[in-house]
Amino acid sequence: MKSRTDQLDFDFSRPIDFQRNICSEIIDDCISELFKEDKNSLFNKHLKILILELYYCWIESDMQFLTVSMSKRGYNSKSRYNPNNISSYLIKVVKLLVKNNLINFHAGFYDHRTKKSRLTRIKSSKMLINQFEKIKLPSTQNINHRKKEYLLLYNKGKLCEYKDSYDTQEIRVILENYNKIVSKTLFDVPNLKRNILVRGDNKKIIISPFSSVFYKKEIEKIDKGLIGGCWWNKIDLHLFLNIKKKLTINNQKTSYIDLTKYFASYLSMISNSNVSIQQRSFSGVLDYDQLCYLIMKGFRSQTSKSFLNSVYKERKKFSLQSFTLSEIREAINNHIMANQKLQNFLYKGKDIGWNFVVSKIFFKLVSEITKIKVPVFLVRDKIYFPTDRESIILEKLEKIIFYELNLNNFKLHAEKASDFNFEKKGFFGRLVKSDIDFSQRYLDNKKLFGLE
């Protein structure tokens, strides 16, 4: 039997989201029950954001922690990323909840093993959970502040403040409209029983109904950025290969476009040469997704030795855990090292920017279709969409890819994602398997998103 300490996973945590909608009435009864005395408005605001986030965190997983700074330096109440103006006053509220036995508190410390400071972890106590269990979450909409920032600008890796421009304002409006669509859309794996996925590096991912999509950019490289923020953006190759044919949008037939088919075209464009990568791998070790990501890892590596050692060490992330080092080395030699056109890229210690291009293509697609409210999702370098909107998605994407990758005379072809049975029912093709084939977790999420 493991000790209580062994069972706690402090890495399974997320920071408090200061951009929640504290005007929500979801937890008002809970707060009234726990705090009978009237407090000042400053206290009430900080109490509400903390209880609200503890509630959302518990809904996501009762094993998940919230990280919170117990230092005044951890707060900037004037930040554009803090529309509720949450200050270090939150520390006082945290201490009060600890005193009243409403949260479990694990103080932050300096980790000598990783040489990093770890923030304090908190989690709802049984007393607080008893109150949460009385709450019925009405929907996943309107949980965020109306001025929530979806464009995140960084300066040398640190989130920074910035003055608005026409470009940033345009990006923000597109992201706001897209996130309204995301908040109303169920994107899920119907037969998955638990809402926790485990990556190849053992990091846990929660299939959260409260996802928000961000566009992260470096302020000095504003033309480049990465789409992220949601559970599906955190999936590694190991997980993706297991669920790519099961991802489903709104309980309907779902398809996807695989952008890795144009990875060689991208390499050709940036190298001004003709790079070819065999899409149908005859390797008993590597499929095409694995091959492309190993190629990119080879580009980022400094030497062939460090590349091979890193691949073998991280082989589970690439879904290669069942193969020996010699088998992996042979596959790499046959399908990467033997490709002469790749030699100009290998072992340069550089990222060639493929993920930036994928995010740019996706963002341009989003900007084209938000007005017609078609839900689309970027999962690694695959774009998922409802099958019944395939023609409009392909039309838009062909124009975007033509412009971004300088491709001529090509035709996009979508692949079917969901491996569940469907039949045509009215205008939409909906899942018709018996509910017994779907997890209770998924059926509950259907109700939450109004898909009964």
Where are these regions (language model features)?
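Amphipathic alpha-helical/coiled-coil segments positioned at domain termini
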Residues: 377-388
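Short, hydrophobic-biased segments on the C-terminal half of alpha helices
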Residues: 91-95, 366
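Conserved catalytic core of nucleic-acid polymerases
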Residues: 1-44, 54-57, 111, 283-376
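Acidic, glycine-rich two-metal-ion catalytic cores of nucleic acid-processing enzymes
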Residues: 121-290, 380-382
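Helical catalytic core of nucleic-acid polymerases
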Residues: 67-86, 231-347
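Short helix->loop/beta-hairpin flanking segments within DNA-binding domains
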Residues: 31-81
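A short, conserved structural fragment
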Residues: 94-112, 375-376
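C-terminal polymerase-core module
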Residues: 302-307, 390-452
